[in-house]
Amino acid sequence: MLTIFSVPKPFLGAIGEIQHRALASWTALGNGVQVLLLGDEEGAAEAARKTGAEHLPELARTDQGTPRLDAAFAAADETARHPLRCFVNADVVLYDDLLDAARRVAAESERFLIVGQTVDVDQPRGREDALARGTRRGAAALDYFVFMSGLYDHVPPFAIGRACFDNWLVWRARQDAIVVDATADVVAAHQGHDYAHVGGGKAEAYYGEEAARNLELAGGKSRLYTLHDASHVLRGGRLHRNPGAPLRWRENVRKAAWKLGVR
């Protein structure tokens, strides 16, 4: 039914434990779910072997050594067994409700993107625990993307893990597909972590040279879409038009005022 693909960080220390937990949740979704781990980070091959995921070590990188989004999507296109895809950050725990949401949206539309807020929670002990203890991360924190093959034929060479590429994915889908905010129906648990894997830390990931390059590749601030730009919402298993026009107006004002510092 679904091919999940992700580009993990090295499976070391605390982030390694976080990623093992996320990976286990994906492979637990059943035999109809194919899981692809992309890139040659330390521990990725062993993690894939232990969980039954597939490991694809070859992945193009930026000049600074960061995995590229276009390469990840191309690898998924070449290897995926299912036309329904999910690109997800490697620290996010998923549950069966994601599959339910995908089925319901796919039954009503052939071209779509499903996104939604994740919840910040450490060591979630199941969906209900994540929902009870988690804190919503906001409309701009995008960690999973569910879509049918063919939606992203031309992906720029974004640096994964830097600002702006996730917002562009929403903008691109919005051009000729419906974008569904599934926050009300899907619980996705984002586990807290540091930015030790990025030289310069979180500031570099969001405001550094590769973030600035991502903004350029995206086509500027006007294309930094968030959940406020979704055309539809999924609530109680039913699709509705997104009533959040005032929120979209406020979001455009926020984006216009945003400054991206380059160091």
Q: How should each PLM-predicted stretch be described?
A:
Residues 37-85:
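Active-site-proximal specificity loops/subdomain of glycosyltransferases
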Residues 3-8, 159-263:
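C-terminal catalytic/acceptor-binding lobe
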Residues 33-40, 114-116:
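Short, hydrophobic beta-strand segments that form beta-sheet elements in well-ordered domains
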Residues 82-95:
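Short beta-strand-to-loop acidic/aromatic patch adjacent to the donor-nucleotide binding site
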